[in-house]
Curated annotation (Swiss-Prot):
Catalysed conversion reaction: GTP + H2O = GDP + phosphate + H(+)
Domain of life of the source: Bacteria
The protein's name in its UniProt record: Elongation factor 4
GO terms classed as biological process: positive regulation of translation
Membrane topology: Peripheral membrane protein
Record has Membrane as a keyword: yes
Record's GO cellular component terms: plasma membrane
Start and end residues of each tr-type G domain: 2-184
Provenance organism: Syntrophobacter fumaroxidans (strain DSM 10017 / MPOB)
Database matches in InterPro entries: EF-4 (IPR006297), EFG_III/V (IPR035647), EFG_V-like (IPR000640), EFTu-like_2 (IPR004161), G_TR_CS (IPR031157), LepA_C_sf (IPR038363), LepA_CTD (IPR013842), LepA_IV (IPR035654)
Family: Belongs to the TRAFAC class translation factor GTPase superfamily. Classic translation factor GTPase family. LepA subfamily.
Length: 598
């Protein structure tokens, strides 16, 4: 066990975690220069396209240190985006130390701080690494000063490297071997292993990634999942190189995988403890904190025939993304579906894209919503995250929405544009901190509902990519909230309802009505599209009717003949409007639900 090091790379988004992981893999000789490609651990197309890491990935690297010692390094590459902090916490629970990466040109950013605190909570050894020293804009001394002042770490211990050019990679590996302690655990104790990831293979069943803390597991053993008591016989164990590499056993301190033919997807839970059925441990390992979803949205299949297929895909997807929470839901307009909870808007987008790409699902997602707390006139309180279940306004005494404390770090020159953006999003109580010359940290309280839609994208736009953002939920505060209904031909469309602040209601209503007007095809009669709060109409668009020229066959003659034909047409249209139902195409829902991003 003294020959094992378990470590993770944590950093702000885009500070070079995946590039450094690529270089470490190359240095360990797992890939030849010919096989090499960028972002080697990011397996999903979507990760490579967006240039971000979504899933933590594990790889075991063989390394001979400078003093000739052979060491096994278990590296877990983590995501940097605020929405995937749960993936980071799972990775940290399996490590003894971390490399905290800081970009030499950008310095310490919001997510760097958030990840540092997470590593401190797990009591891990922290090695600061200053990356991107090859850039012309790199300011190493200033970055060292920030590491001292903002992170409270000894900057003289920081390792300098350029992951892109491959400089300083040996220094990073030596620091891992020298400074990160080997895992502690007892080989002769009963098996206890923590599941930190899992994915479904249609041939082999569920493949579980775990960190063994005590004991050992080998093929033929009968294991038990402690959360539900399910038992299975182990078929194969091994470690992760770039693909799975079978081993005779996994011993205490090792990170690897276990295949035991689990076909019941719900039996394997991330955060669960594996033990031997014949000699179980008395108590499970402390898992991870429960996930609290922040953003809610409903997912419906475009064709109602695909409902069961979507249910199956969600169950398999949940294995690989423990942060997703879902339950059954139904809508008059869209049929059967699922109400899902996400960690943020990027998480929502990724779930949508992965369901479409990896599981071949065609889906519609409703407007994202947050969880509101309502106090009713009878004194009871209720939590609502779905506009369909928003009670009658007469019954509501007060409504409260979640507020966050946002921490925004930006170059000083963007101060005006960022403050305007925050105030437009109903931000209050700004506080300013100047960590280093030319940089400002703004702390501000904002409603989560305003941040959920497009705040992060807009912040990146106004700061030309230099702004960084992190947030913590603080509390629910009383706000003037209303339910905005969209009516088409005087009928409510439940899938388009949303809960908004009264000040923003008209702006939203106009936006949705105008978008629907473009999408709904013309009928034989006029269609009114209205936005309403209760019985009060606050916005309207009209889809004009097709019109047949009924007077075309009248050549000259008495005007009363033409008038009679026009009156007859008018009556027919009126009758048609009373009985005619408007077909809203699925494309209209998709277009309107994207209206918030534009």
């Amino acid at each position: 066990m003294t020959k094992i090091r378990n470590f993770s790379i944590i950093a702000h988004i885009d500070h070079g975690k995946s590039t450094l992981a690529d270089r470490l893999i190359q240095r360990a000789g797992l890939v030849t220069d010919r096989q090499f490609r960028d972002q080697i651990l990011d397996n999903m197309d979507i990760e490579r396209e967006r240039g971000i890491t979504i899933k933590s990935q594990t790889v075991t690297l063989p390394y001979r240190s400078r003093n000739g010692e052979e060491v096994e390094l278990n590296l877990i590459d983590t995501p940097g985006h605020v929405d995937f902090s749960y993936e980071v916490s799972r990775a940290l629970a399996s490590c003894e130390g971390v490399l905290l990466l800081v970009d030499a040109s950008q310095g310490v950013q919001a997510q760097t701080l958030a990840n540092l605190y997470a590593a401190m909570e797990h009591d891990l050894t922290i090695i600061p690494v200053i990356n991107k020293i090859d850039l012309l804009s790199a300011d190493i001394e200033n970055t060292r000063a920030q590491i001292e002042s903002e992170l409270g770490l000894d900057s003289s211990q920081a390792v300098l490297c350029s992951a892109k050019e491959g400089r300083g990679i040996d220094d990073v590996l030596e620091a891992v071997v020298d400074r990160i302690p080997p895992p502690s655990g007892k080989l002769d104790a009963p098996l206890s292993a923590l599941i930190f990831d899992a994915h479904y293979d249609s041939f082999r069943g569920t493949i579980v990634a775990c960190r063994v803390f005590d004991g050992s597991v080998r093929p033929g053993d009968v294991i038990r999942f402690m959360s539900n008591g399910a038992t299975y016989k182990v078929e194969e164990v091994g470690v992760f190189r770039l693909s799975r590499e079978p081993k005779k056993e996994l011993r205490a301190g090792m990170v690897g995988y276990v295949i035991s033919g689990v076909k019941t997807v719900s039996d394997t839970r991330v955060g669960d403890t594996i033990t031997l059925d014949s000699n179980p441990v008395p108590a499970p390992l402390p898992g991870f904190k429960e996930v609290k979803p922040v953003v809610f949205s409903s997912i419906y299949p475009i064709s109602s025939d695909d409902y069961l297929s979507l249910a199956d895909s969600l169950e398999k997807y949940k294995l690989n993304d423990a942060a997703l929470i879902y339950q059954k839901d139904s809508s008059v307009a869209l049929g059967q579906g699922f109400r899902c909870g996400f960690l943020g808007l990027l998480h929502l987008e990724i779930v949508q894209e992965r369901l479409e790409r990896e599981y071949d699902q065609s889906i519609i997602m409703t407007f994202p919503s947050v969880q509101y707390v309502l106090t009713l006139e009878d004194g009871s309180t209720t939590m609502v995250d779905n506009p369909q279940y928003y009670p009658d306004p007469i019954r509501i005494r007060t409504s409260a929405e979640p507020f966050i404390k946002a921490s925004i770090i930006i170059p000083e020159r963007y101060m005006g544009a960022v403050m305007k953006l925050c105030l437009d999003k109903r931000g209050v109580n700004p506080r300013f901190n100047y960590p280093t010359p030319g940089r400002i940290e703004i702390s501000m309280e904002m409603p989560l509902a305003e941040v959920v839609f497009d705040f992060y994208d807009k912040l990146k736009t106004v700061t030309q990519g230099y702004g960084s953002f992190d947030y913590d939920l603080i509390e629910h505060r009383v706000s003037d909230l209303v339910k905005l209904d969209i009516l088409v031909n005087s009928e409510k469309v439940d899938a388009l309802s949303l809960i908004v602040h009264r000040e923003r209601a008209r702006e939203w209503a106009v936006q949705v009505c105008d978008r629907l007007k473009e999408e709904i095809p013309r009928h034989q009669f006029k269609i009114a599209i209205q936005g309403a709060i209760g019985g009060k109409i606050i916005a309207r668009s009209t889809v004009n009717a097709f019109r047949k020229d009924v007077t075309a066959k009248c050549y000259g003659g008495d005007i009363s003949r033409k008038r009679k034909l026009l009156e007859k047409q008018k009556k027919g249209k009126k009758r048609m409007k009373m009985v005619g139902s408007v077909m809203i195409p699925q494309s209209a829902f998709v277009a309107v639900l994207k209206a918030d991003n534009e």
